[in-house]
Every structure is written in structure tokens, then in C-alpha cells.
Amino acid sequence: MIHQSHAYHMVKPSPWPLTGALSALLMTSGLAMWFHFHSTTLLMLGLLTNMLTMYQWWRDVMRESTYQGHHTLPVQKGLRYGMILFITSEVFFFAGFFWAFYHSSLAPTPQLGAHWPPTGITPLNPLEVPLLNTSVLLASGVSITWAHHSLMENNRNQMIQALLITILLGLYFTLLQASEYFEAPFTISDGIYGSTFFVATGFHGLHVIIGSTFLTICLIRQLMFHFTSKHHFGFEAAAWYWHFVDVVWLFLYVSIYWWGS
């Protein structure tokens, strides 16, 4: 790995934030087109653009950090601030969903039967699949911490093992969540309960998929000897993101599954 000890910002401007924003616009517009006009063309274009952006952005980060040595201290500091601000924006994103849920559940209107859950809604049992999902995510939080400590101690094999376990637990969580959606006795169209439940848990599920992808890239990089005990911010950012996903799920479980049922 090339290392430069001077304090200069070496990374050149990147086009990928712009293409990433455009792909997000295409995906959200495509989702609306799919819902209202049953056309998936724009959505597929958005997904393709997003995947190409992800691939090329990660490729450039690997080249700049590992092969060119451009991740000097100011660059690493900028990346840390960027990740912190990104996670902060995600906190506010989920705050909106919790606000919608509590606004509706703390003072249910007469149209909902003046109680929560609304009349006609059979909520999911919080002690069944949701509790298993909670256990799976908490276990993944332990394994990602194990991976981080192994990397700090230059224990390559244990780091790979722990990271693989985390990814598999993330995949298992996603499959459990999908099976829960298929078996749920209500849909996203069933009033405010259905919409807040599926939007909040669905967006969390999307974040689990994104986090699993992030960790998979880290696993590939670790297999290629890209990380050292002193230079591994890519993995650190993924670990921060994964812990954020864990914490959000705990709030979702307590609020929507346990208290809300």
C-alpha cells in the first residue's frame, strides 16, 4: 500500500456524487411511475444507473486509497466528517417515520376506532419473528465488533470469518423480514397503521441491504489485502453504518412491534 505522510488533499473531484443523485431521482420517479402507471422502465434505468455509480465510485476509492496513496490525513478527516453527516441525515430521515407513527398512535382519531391498533388490524406478535430478527441483528453487531478488533490486532483470518458471519446474519435478517411481509395479515394500503409499519420497516430493510452490500465490498477488499490495522476507514465507515442500522431496529421493535401492538 502506498502511503503519503504530507497533509495535502490529493483526491481529485469525482462525478459519482452527481450521477448517484441523478440515479436516486430516477429511482424515486420510477417508483411513482410503477405505482401509478405500471411502468418499470424508469425504475430499471434508475437501478442500473445506481449500480454503475456504486461500482465505479467504490473502484475509484480503492484506487485512490490503496494504489495511489491519496488518502492523506485531511482526506481521511473529510471522509469521517462526511460519514458522520450522512448518518446524521439518516437519523432525521427515520425521525420522520417515528413522528408519523407516534402522531397517529398516541391520539387515535374516531375514524381509527379511537384506539390503537386501529379497528380491523391484527398486529404481528412481537415475540415471534420480530424477536428473532432482533436477536439476529444484535448478534451481527457483536460479530462486526469482533471483526473490527481482529483487524486492529492484524488477525486477518478472524477478521474475514467475523465479517462473513455479519454478512450472512444480514442476509438472514432480510429473508426473515421478507417472509414476515408475505405472511402479514395487513398491507401497506390498510390505513395509517399499514402505511407507517411497511414504510418504516421497509426503509430499515433497505438500509440492511445497503449495509450488507457495503460489508461485502469490505470483505472483498480484505481478501485482496487492502486493509491494515492503521488504514481501514472503509471498513470503519461500514461498521458505523451497521451499528446505526442496529440501533434503528431496536427503536422500531420497541415502538412499532412491541408498544404499537
Swiss-Prot record:
It is a multi-pass membrane protein. Residues 1-15, 67-72, 153-155, 224-232 are mitochondrial matrix. One of its GO terms (biological process) is mitochondrial electron transport, cytochrome c to oxygen. One of its GO terms (molecular function) is cytochrome-c oxidase activity. It is an enzyme of class 7 (translocase). GO terms for cellular component: mitochondrial inner membrane; mitochondrion; respiratory chain complex IV. The chain crosses the membrane at residues 16-34, 41-66, 73-105, 129-152, 156-183, 191-223, 233-256. It catalyses: 4 Fe(II)-[cytochrome c] + O2 + 8 H(+)(in) = 4 Fe(III)-[cytochrome c] + 2 H2O + 4 H(+)(out). Signal peptide: none annotated. Its EC number is 7.1.1.9. Residues 35-40, 106-128, 184-190, 257-261 are mitochondrial intermembrane. SUPFAM superfamilies: Cytochrome c oxidase subunit III-like. It is found in: Mitochondrion inner membrane. Keywords: Membrane, Mitochondrion, Mitochondrion inner membrane, Translocase, Transmembrane, Transmembrane helix. It holds the Pfam family COX3. Belongs to the cytochrome c oxidase subunit 3 family. Component of the cytochrome c oxidase (complex IV, CIV), a multisubunit enzyme composed of 14 subunits. The complex is composed of a catalytic core of 3 subunits MT-CO1, MT-CO2 and MT-CO3, encoded in the mitochondrial DNA, and 11 supernumerary subunits COX4I, COX5A, COX5B, COX6A, COX6B, COX6C, COX7A, COX7B, COX7C, COX8 and NDUFA4, which are encoded in the nuclear genome. Component of the cytochrome c oxidase, the last enzyme in the mitochondrial electron transport chain which drives oxidative phosphorylation. The respiratory chain contains 3 multisubunit complexes succinate dehydrogenase (complex II, CII), ubiquinol-cytochrome c oxidoreductase (cytochrome b-c1 complex, complex III, CIII) and cytochrome c oxidase (complex IV, CIV), that cooperate to transfer electrons derived from NADH and succinate to molecular oxygen, creating an electrochemical gradient over the inner membrane that drives transmembrane transport and the ATP synthase. This is Cytochrome c oxidase subunit 3. The gene is MT-CO3.
